[in-house]
Amino acid sequence: YVFSILLLVKKDALTGLLNRQAYYSETSRAYKDITAIVSIDMNGLKKINDTYGHQAGDEALITLALCFKRSCNVRQSAYRMGGDEFAIVCYKNTEEEVLKLIERINEHVGKTNYTCSIGYCFQKDGRIELDELLKVSDEKMYQNKAEYYKTNQ
């Protein structure tokens, strides 16, 4: 019973992914094993919500979450950080494994009607603070998002 309640607290109700609270809880415990964070932001969610309604936006988020789940291996965990923002934490991955993860994400998302912008930060020695990993990953994702909107207006 207690396990069920803990699981509910750590899961995002809409997508079934782990939530922001789980992200902070789990990453603080396993920090030394984290080699990369991948930041993902859905492109065009506001337009979907405004054009087709929030139910369509929710369906888009659920679809993308499934793409992220399918892309992860056992040493990669997907989280919904809030809104249309997601993160994947990679434990004891090489940079090549992280790039293959991003390739799988792009492949799965490419089969949908949606797009997303992705950035990542990799470290092999555990010297970068977790907040800095996420900050750099987010910055790269926002650079990619700006490029996307520059070419898709």
Region locations from a protein language model:
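Regulatory sensory/coupling modules that transmit signals to nucleotide-handling catalytic cores
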Residues: 1-6, 107
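Conserved nucleotide-binding and Mg2+-coordinating catalytic segments in signaling enzymes
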Residues: 5-25, 40-54, 62
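Residue-level recognition of strand-loop junctions within catalytic nucleotide-signaling folds
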Residues: 50, 89-93, 123-124
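Active-site-proximal alpha-helical element of nucleotidyl cyclase-like catalytic domains
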Residues: 56-75
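Short helix/loop segment flanking the catalytic signature motif in cyclic-nucleotide metabolism enzymes
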Residues: 60, 87-105
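A short pre-motif secondary-structure segment
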Residues: 77-80
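Catalytic-core segments of nucleotide cyclases and related cyclic-nucleotide turnover enzymes
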Residues: 99-106, 110, 122-153
